[in-house]
Amino acid sequence: MHSDAPTPVANELSEVSHLAEGDNASFSAGNFTVLQLPSDPSHCIDYAIPAGTLVIVDPNNPDNNRTVKLQAPAVFRPQCALGGTRAPAPRPEESFPDWSEYQKYHHNDRRDPFYGSVTPIAYTIAASTVTAWMLLIILFLSRKPSPLFQKIAVLITAVSLTVFLAQATDTLESQYNEGYQNAYELRHKIMGGWAFRILQVITCVITWLARLQVVIRLFDVPKINTRLAVVGSTLIFTNATIWACLNLIPPWSQYVRNAKSVLPVFGALCSLLLEVFYLVVVVIYSISKRKYAYSRTSIVMAAISWLAMILPMVFIVFDIAHYWIAGWSDFIRWTADAAASVVVWEWTNVIVYQERREQRQSVLGRQVYRDEILDFKGDNGGGTVGGGRTKYPSRMEEDDVPFRSSPNDHHFTSNIPTSAGEGQSFQFFKRARLPMYSRKIWKIARGESAASNNTHYEHAIIEEEEEESIERNRRTPTVQENGEEDDEETYDEENDQYSQDNHSSVHSFESSRPSQHPVPSSGGTRAVGHTHFPLPGQSEGAHTTSPAAAAAAAEPEPEPVAGPSGGAAAHGDSDDDSDNSDDSSLASFTVIQQTGFSVDNQGVPEYDADSAPPTFEPIPGFHRQDYSDAKG
């Protein structure tokens, strides 16, 4: 638009700048057009103007319209009262004939870089929203259940990003209709509202709680899980408190930073510390399971998991280094934080599946640690929680033992006849003598085949230096594949018969009372080992004998019974003249392995539908009254 107003000289740019002051001032030049000049002093910017005719139009006051003839390229600088953040340059049009002249002096145009424009913001919001909804669909379509916090975190992330995408679309459409693009306005429209600030704090807490669930699943040792939970919870709520102060307490804001305040930097460092903590824990787990974590079938899942864990750390560093990246990197961080829990959880499922499949095909089975308690009460306490953590059985309701148990006790349930009647539950508790940190190695025997349903657990051997001398003098009974114990036979000259010296392990005790040999039941049972337990209130060297036990000892010795495989019985006769007669108060029972009972790869017993749970067959002559007499 040209006017007939008098043309001022070319060097009167100060007058041009003065006339351009105003909220709705606009001007046009030969090569491009600015529809509206910035009215906020913080939006001041220099505009490169090539040679040509410059027409200044003031819609509020047409009398102020001026036309300037520029003989050479120039720079238009509004006389703003204050300096501040520069707004992007006006939108040029390549259709103008002097576009090449404008390109020559493009270096004078102080527009924001491309990564600070509206384009990265639009792309990142759209891509992050699509990724979040895909994660949510995968999470709910998965056959295995996912943690509750994980579902809530992904759902909130997907809904929040959808709301932000709608706001960004409306703002970009408004700017397009007015003929300009302003990244600052777009960021302020999305991130300046209370919805974004509140959702950011809530999503931060729930997402990190979902990650904490993943961390707790990775380790089966309860003490390690407790420590990780305490450290992780402390870091999570500290980080949430910092970001709540930055977003909810004015005048602090995440994007309007005060150089004198260290709170934004401290919050970023706290977030970085959380990311490192999560990464280190997952790396330790993946190294311990490297055979399964980085196999050919799981290498793709491992790469995606690493990418999801590293991306938030990279963008946190970028946010600290450069201001403009914070305008769109937050959306990537939101999606990456949600994916870091979902993808790592699925990666763990792949690792556990491969490990279980190999353990079912192997001979040794799975490892059992010191802190794990194997529950043999069937459906009452068996089973696992999450990804393989052993479920700790509580004190059993039907237990009428007159002393209380602790989490360190080993539970052995028996079908010993009690005063309440035949078949009532009876339970022995063997107190753990060694500290919690000592590990337990279970001797495992396989019967007839290498399948996991033939796994039998024997006595526990404690790896302690002070027990080395005891281990050299004692031999732990082993279980052969036919179910019989390999005991040494000695000749008793006085009684003119052979007897077997039953050596006990660290946690077992010998009884001088003649041992009785169980007869296999019709269900195809097999004796897999025997354990002797002292009665409560009696020590190993006690010299007291209950009347019932004395009567049982006076009974005639039965004939040896053949074992399940047709050979001699696993237990022989002990020496009647030995010095161990003071141990007659010790109760002895034999574990009977029934057909259909198996131990799965998690160390939890499983039963077939047509078979009964495993029982403990007592020594004949030992009754519940003996237990009461011994305790009294």
From Swiss-Prot:
Gene Ontology BP annotations: cellular response to pH
Residues in compartment: Cytoplasmic: 142-145, 211-228, 286-297, 353-632
Protein known as: pH-response regulator protein palH/RIM21
Membrane-topology descriptor: Multi-pass membrane protein
Protein family: Belongs to the palH/RIM21 family.
Signal sequence bounds: none
UniProt subcellular location: Cell membrane
Location of region: Disordered: 380-419, 462-632
Biased composition (Basic and acidic residues): 623-632
Low complexity composition bias: residue spans: 546-571
A family per Pfam: PalH
